[in-house]
Amino acid sequence: MALLTISIDTDFEEFWRYNLVVMASIKRDGEQVELLKYKSEIAPVGAELSAKPSNYPEDRGVRLKCEAGDALTLYIYVIPHTLPSDKYVRYAPPYELSVSVKRGNSNIYTHRHMINQWSGENLVVDIQTER
């Protein structure tokens, strides 16, 4: 059976201001057969950090692998714990979060989602992966 590789990345320099939670539900014949969970918590919500933590990882990209099914649903939660550095909305535009899914070596989903710096985002991505 083919493997799915789920990748989530951003080049946003202030991504340290956000916690990230990812869940992936894999279905076969309409039944959930696997649930993957990933959590990257930098600080508690409301922390209002003044600078990037010294232990912040160089590459905070997400890589998840699982066996393919018929369908994949991704739940991606980008949760701000520290407000944007600029207090004016016009100077804190949305940033890109790239999500891609490969089945074996074939790319079956690629999209750049825009993330609001003030509120973060809750993304739900449904993909037919075909076995």
Where is each model-derived feature located?
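Short, surface-exposed binding/anchoring microloops in extracellular/periplasmic proteins
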Residues: M1-E34
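Short amphipathic, basic-aromatic surface patches that mediate peripheral association
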Residues: D9-F12, I79-V89
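Short coil-to-beta strand junction motifs in C2/discoidin
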Residues: R17-V22, V89-S98
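Surface-exposed loop/edge segments in extracytoplasmic proteins
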Residues: R28-Y38, G46-A51, N105-R112
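Mature extracytoplasmic domains of secretory-pathway proteins
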Residues: K39-S85
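Short, solvent-exposed aromatic-acidic interface loops
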Residues: E41-A43, H111-L123
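Exposed aromatic-hydrophobic patches
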Residues: E58-K65, E121-E130
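Extracellular or exported targeting regions of proteins
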Residues: D70-P84, P94-E96, S100-R103, T110-R112, ...
